[in-house]
Amino acid sequence: MTKFTTEEVRSKFITYFKANNHTHVPASSLIPDNDPSLMFVNSGMVQFKNVFTGQEKRSYNKAVTSQKSLRAGGKHNDLEHVGYTARHHTFFEMLGNFSFGDYFKEQAIYYTWDLLTKEFELPKDKLYVTIYHTDDTAASYWEKISGLRDDRIIKIKTNDNFWSMGDTGPCGPCSEIFYDHGEEIYGGLPGTKDEDCDRFIEIWNMVFMQYEQINKETRIELPKKSIDTGMGLERMTAVLQHVNNNYDIDLFQEIINFTENIVKVKVDGEAKFSYRVIADHLRASSFLIADGIIPSNEGRGYVLRRIMRRAMRHAHMLGAKEPLMYKLLPKLVDLMGNIYPELKIAEGFISSILEQEEIRFKTTLERGLKLLTEETKTLTKGNKLSGEVAFKLYDTYGFPLDLTEDILKNRDIAVDHKGFEELMLIQKERARTSWLGSGESKTDQLWFDIKEQYGSTEFLGYTLNEAKCKIIALIKNNNLADTIQEVDTQFLLIANQTPFYGESGGQMGDIGMIFSQDSEVEVIDTLKYLRSIIVHKCILKKGKINIGENANFNIDIKYRKNLRIHHSATHILHAVLHKILGKQVIQKGSLVTSTYLRFDINHSKAITNEEITLIEDKVNEIIRNNHEVNTTVMFTEDAIKQGAIALFGEKYDSEVRVVKIGETSLELCCGTHVKRTGDIGAFKIISESSIAAGVRRIEAVCGEFVIKLIREKDNLIKLIESSVKTNKNELITKVTNILERNKELEKELEKAHLAGLDLSIEQIKKQAEQIAGIKLLYKKVGNINNKILRQAAENLTQKLENLIVVYIAHGVGKLSITVAVSKAITDKFNAGIIAKELSLFLGGSGGGGKASIAQSGGNDIVNLTNINKKLLSLIVT
């Protein structure tokens, strides 16, 4: 049997099916875009789910893939086993061939047997197959094609050999192929009590999708039958490399050996498991980040953080003192970057995230481990760690619960899950992660009390700009009030309903006026507390306002219009960024104001001028096309199923508002929007910058503010034209000439300054003061740059062996100090010390340099009159 590399196994599988008229379909993202029930893509068929159900048509009816997959959340959670067993992984590759109404059982079985026995040269006497116990058709095809005896075609009665997509939908019997590693390894045949041991290993699974489940009692034949298969690349490679452990294949061994060369710990004993965990989790972490997931405390981001921190804890166990994971990334990219180019594209970003997360976790890891050691000193085998300690490790030290369990596993100590979950529930109820309303102070408790008494504020502003509302609470200086009657007093106001939008989802709150029978109130901002109470920040302009009275609430219509314009533009921008920069782009934050918008994204490098132009052009094209903007309310699950973008870190209720902009954008959003994209008018990016490692910020203006920007720039150009006496066509040439001439003049000025400071030996002796056996030359000069002063001072100290030169340059609001000492006397006088003391004397922060030359600064110009006395004291002492 030929020995194949991992790359050769993958390549041969794909090549075989391409030769048999299958279309090679690239792997989809690990983030499913067609199945909200899945946290991650966990098999090859996920990207074809809608094809199997008939909801989607493609240009091909046969496909082959190598699909990146991940099992580390939900019911497919293999995390705790990874590294300790032979075949558990978080990240793995699933090879698969698929037929959508084309070939069926006979051809599928033929392809499988032909590829395994001829292309991969597996011995026939090493192979067993299983079928569903009623699938006589599959049994007859296996006998016909493979020639296997009846005892090697095993009928299974359980649902292990019958697959379904859910309670309803396509389903069908399965057939699995097993490889026998030999009698020297313990294990039983499929269907026996020892089937889960390591002798007989499943290497390929075929699903014969021939039925549709209508309901619990009814199942009918599908008119077009399909094939879905899956072969674990790592398992198959282990078989073809004659090893019984996936971590012994070439791909993992390369990563493990690379890691060993860095940490210098031998791969054996307990360390062996740590190396395996790191190798597996490096792959999972890197591919998740490449697909746009960032470590966080919720959802997919939290699964990523758990994986990363588990690997980092094992790196710590190997004695790694510095961040390790990012140093291993180049090896992974080298091994897998060709088949998965997203790794190469995102390498810099992945490296940055890996390093940042490890640095962040290392600061608390050792303290958390110390706490865990202290708390488990008295615990013995079979005991439980208290939920309180587990929660403290989670909340204070960033230990995911499964990391704590992983650490305690070898000591057979469990964790009190119930106690942990109770404390988690208390934390959520207190909303500690909210920017307001943690329940931990009197003020915060006030908001909980208001919410408990009055419930959520009804928002009317999607359809109304003004409304009559009842005032239910007035708050002044963090205390409830019955009446506000001091004019110009600032206070908070809550009503039963309001057309004012409370700041949320990145959109600023509304401003406007409230009129009651006896008062006029200016609303200077509108906020949202505890995600549901709309709070008006007000100033009393006239009269008095009372709790319980009705008032007319009027938003500033123009202000709201500009908010709508900029908010809708952020949705369009988001969609365009996906098209131009890639679908891995994730919104990290946004701010929608009435005058501009701000949009933060994960992106590892600066957005080029060419890309900015493309983005602007595409956004403006969508604006000009005047697409309709529709909003609907639906269940969150249904919205996501339809492809609506849900932002990571955002919390959503069971029902959400979905904003659809033509065929361009579909997002969950509670904000206010234009009716048609043409209402936006125009879009212009005004800045692009980095605000953190791997995060870029785009700022832009829309509508009338684009016109204003153009007018300002046009006026600026006209002013420059007038100043330099030229026209627009000659402006660049004229300015370039001026700048070049300015450089020449600066050089001439520097030469003049240097010449003016140069003195002959006789002039030095004449101008310098004789003190304590040395000569001191002190001069106050104008605003001359430090480079010239340094050069001039050094030139003079080279002419005399016992000279100290001190220049103090007086610039605009600051002083520059230069001190030079002849090298012959640096054993007695240190320029660095003198410069530092002078700086402190003149209000600076000190400075320094070498013994022979130093520079510093100050800003106490008044004290400059006493500098002579200070200089003398420094030299005489």
UniProtKB/Swiss-Prot annotation:
Q: Name one GO biological process term.
A: alanyl-tRNA aminoacylation
User: PROSITE patterns recorded for this chain?
Assistant: AA_TRNA_LIGASE_II_ALA (PS50860)
Query: Which residues does Zn(2+) bind?
Result: H567, H571, C669, H673
Q: Which GO terms describe its cellular component?
A: cytosol
* Keywords annotated in UniProt: Aminoacyl-tRNA synthetase, ATP-binding, Cytoplasm, Ligase, Metal-binding, Nucleotide-binding, Protein biosynthesis, RNA-binding, tRNA-binding, Zinc
- List locations, semicolon-separated: Cytoplasm
Q: Which PANTHER family match?
A: ALANINE--TRNA LIGASE, CYTOPLASMIC, ALANYL-TRNA SYNTHETASE
Function (record text): Catalyzes the attachment of alanine to tRNA(Ala) in a two-step reaction: alanine is first activated by ATP to form Ala-AMP and then transferred to the acceptor end of tRNA(Ala). Also edits incorrectly charged Ser-tRNA(Ala) and Gly-tRNA(Ala) via its editing domain.
What is the recorded name of this protein?
A: Alanine--tRNA ligase
Q: Which organism is it from?
A: Rickettsia typhi (strain ATCC VR-144 / Wilmington)
- Name of the gene this protein is made from: alaS
